[in-house]
């Protein structure tokens, strides 16, 4: 591991501490022009996201005004009611973005995929740099 990466990992609590935990939850206030442009204004305005630490998964709750939640993993995303009943799901969600432009609206499962993927990445940094296959040069 490079000295700089080692320093950054230690500044984030260290690998030993990180490995003692399986998940992390964060309360969020999310805004910006993108959500309205994509037809999903306010869906994630105030939410709690929980992400797996290491294993790639995430969940936002509430998702919209009726206390639904999302379940994100790389090859599946679902929208569930508060009791866990699947209301809508998308298998291989990344492929559903083929041909999209900046103006293309997103479906709710696409929003759940985008938000889950982004938050899992953000909240697992800098530890993602330690994953097998990552070049530290």
Regions found by a protein language model. Name each.
Residues 1-4, 137:
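Short intrinsically disordered, low-complexity coil segments enriched in acidic
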């Amino acid at each position: 591991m490079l000295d700089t990466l080692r320093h950054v990992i230690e500044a984030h609590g260290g690998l030993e501490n990180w490995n003692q935990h399986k998940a992390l939850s964060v309360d969020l206030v999310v805004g910006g022009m993108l959500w309205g442009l994509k037809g999903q204004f306010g869906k994630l305005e105030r939410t709690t996201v929980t992400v797996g630490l290491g294993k790639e998964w995430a969940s936002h709750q509430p998702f919209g005004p009726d206390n639904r939640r999302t379940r994100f993993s790389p090859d599946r995303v679902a929208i569930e009611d508060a009791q866990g009943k699947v209301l809508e799901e998308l298998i291989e969600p990344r492929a559903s973005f083929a041909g999209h432009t900046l103006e293309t609206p997103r479906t709710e499962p696409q929003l759940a995929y985008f938000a889950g993927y982004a938050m899992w990445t953000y909240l697992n940094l800098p530890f993602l740099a330690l994953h097998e296959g990552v070049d530290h040069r």
